[in-house]
A protein has these predicted regions:
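Hydrophobic alpha-helical connector segments
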Residues: 78-110, 161
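Short amphipathic alpha-helical segment with a characteristic S/N-K-E followed by hydrophobic residues
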Residues: 24, 39, 62-67, 77-78, ...
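Hydrophobic alpha-helical segments that form the core
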Residues: 153-175, 186-193
Length: 199
């Protein structure tokens, strides 16, 4: 197993074999990092996990379902923080996202998935639904509250604002490279953004 990958969290529902299911998820994560989505097969996961064919197909009928569940385990849902200010909310949310990406192999997996998803509509749909949208939803709630508090002027395109807030971290991670634990100064980013967003 990759040294960066932690054991997955407990699976939802009532799995027939928790140990087998976690072994399958760990194997899927390792192979996604090592060979990518395109080369990953149910058989390779089964072999790596050391389980029988019936065990893996009893819960996952396809590679898409298995990878989707693996992404869900690795990238947890985020609740929108409510500290009373946009700066406080964004700092809390950004900290949670960075901490998540820095553990469990996420920082290694995300560039691999993003690169392959450009040419694979099915993978892109999984990536967007399970990784991108939950984070956008949390940030959207943060921005909506900021508008309600009068910190951001009304009438702005919130989807564009989400891109502006999230863009620097994505660019630093995938283009210029950097430590996920210390990507950039959130204070500096907030100062630059608020100069253009304040009423």
């Amino acid at each position: 197993m990759s040294e960066t990958a932690e054991s997955p969290r407990r699976m939802p529902g009532r799995p027939r074999s928790e140990a087998s299911n976690q072994a399958i998820i760990r194997a899927t994560l390792e192979l996604l990092i090592e060979v990518g989505y395109g080369a990953l097969t149910m058989e390779s996961v089964r072999t790596r996990a050391g389980v029988g064919k019936a065990t893996i197909y009893r819960r996952w009928s396809s590679k898409e379902e298995l990878v989707s569940d693996t992404i869900v385990f690795l990238h947890e849902e985020f609740e929108a923080p409510d500290t009373g200010s946009l700066r406080g909310d964004y700092e809390a949310l950004a900290g949670a996202v960075r901490a998540s990406a820095s553990r469990g192999g996420a920082a290694m997996l995300m560039p691999r998935l993003l690169g392959e998803s450009v040419h694979d509509p099915e993978l892109f749909a999984i990536f967007r639904a399970n990784l991108v949208e939950p984070r956008r939803a949390a940030l959207r709630s943060v921005l909506e509250r900021a508008v309600a508090r009068g910190e951001i002027r009304e009438g702005l395109d919130l989807e564009l604002l989400i891109d502006l807030f999230a863009g620097p971290a994505v660019y630093r991670l995938f283009i210029t490279g950097g430590d996920m634990a210390q990507m950039f100064s959130i204070d500096a980013q907030m100062d630059a953004l608020m100069n253009g967003l304040a009423p």
